[in-house]
Amino acid sequence: MKKIFVSLILIPVVLTTILACNDHKAPERVGISVDQFTAELKKGGFEVAQGYFQLWRIEDCPKSFEVMGTCYFNNPTAPYVMAVVPYWPNEFVDPATLGAFGATDPGYGATFRFDPNEAIVIFGFLPPKAAYFGLQSYLFTQKGEFQTNNATYDLIVKIGAEEVFFHKVPHNQARIGSFDSLSNSNNNVVIDRQSGGSFNQFRYFIITPDQYMDKQVRQVLHKLSVADKDIFTERIPSNMRFGLDADADDFASGIRYSMPDDGGKEGTASYKWRHNPTLTLLRIRDTQPHRLSRLYPAWEGDSPERRTAVDEWYLETDLNRLVQRVSQAWGQACPDPMCSGRAARFIDTQTPDFNLVGPKCDNIGMDCLADTQDASYQFRGGYGFDNDEVYAVVGTLGTATGNATYVSLGVNNFHLRLGAENVEGTKLVGSADPRWYPGVNNLGKFYVYYFTRHCEGLEELTHGFCLSVQDTELAIPPGVQATFVERDYMVPGTQRGPDSKLVLPPMVIQFQRPAQ
């Protein structure tokens, strides 16, 4: 587990200049120092403690699985950077969730209760330019029972995934796992639109359930000459169970940072930022006795920001025809126009009756698996790799249809609930070529990508668009089933992912590897 400690005592002007040049945009001012900010807060009678950040990687999955029975179906190309907070002296620490995101220093945790009179403040330089940056908080566990008398539960039972989405905390059966979003995220587009810049810029984030705390923190920042446009508040909704006692809700906050322009390999600026973010985390609370909190509105089913998309369903006939052409190319033709028995359509998780949307999950005690409105999620599960199976995933390419800034096509380990392998959208471009799949319209808007144990020897059929799925513990080991998942992130010109009901679900076709 990578522990990340940051102390921004003072940000030199020269660093500001270098970072600004990388983004071709000069920031308006240098950020404040930790000591300066802390001193002003304490003058106002606030208690202040400093936390740190911790990178959660695929390698950390086994420990998380021991604690929570899940690895959260992560996106392997965007490891979580988790906020690790110092516990308040009177805060209950649930031993059942300690280490949920890896070991932390004594007195610190990546999951925490919320004092109704507190705020978490994160500030500093954002990372180098990338396809996506987002900061979001989640309800992690709660006391109670999940509901089974609803259409969502019935659907999930039907596909055999009820233990994924409806479950108790393994070592505390009085609580259920949630991981439900609590707000619309503060992502790079939101930050750009409000402040005029995001990547490589100094910005401030307040996470709080209390309007009074938001106002007080902002007043201190204004006193330090911070412009209001550079401050972003995540409003934790009032329909959570606040408090520091054992019965209160448990929360988590994290950062997603995806597909940096510099490639993200070791030694790059983005790699360094991800492993040691130039951010500071402070936990702040009001010490006034008996002050009533001014809570924010509840987070309800219709609260998430409304999303748009280009309607892709006009491409359905072309998709079905492409599935036919792919099958013919393999000499394993479909039995009918829908390729029944061999091809299966992905499931859209965000529309009814699945409803993988934070407040809708919370209403029935469902685990939303760290959902976000910044992407659409479609999946299909129940596939093995032990008997020479070859799978073709055929779908629309969101970057070509106008529904995504970037696309992710992944393979999940169903047992560990782990995002094991991933194909970035740039590697899907050109995979649906008319030379290989003739007679299909709009091929430039599609992809065809293959998954099997060993791609070697299949080049004439896959044309190089193939991923060899490893049989290691943290990939898809023998006997473990896999799930395919497609994510479309951030519709161009908007600040959210696509309205998933307008996204044409991909299809997966199963073939048998040809005899040598």
PLM regions with names:
Residues 17-20:
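C-terminal motif of bacterial Sec signal peptides marking the signal peptidase cleavage site
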Residues 1-8:
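Bacterial N-terminal signal peptides that target proteins for export
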Residues 12-15:
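Alpha-helical transmembrane segments
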Residues 22-24:
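Bacterial signal peptide processing site
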Residues 27-516:
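A compositional/structural signature for long, glycine/proline-rich flexible linkers
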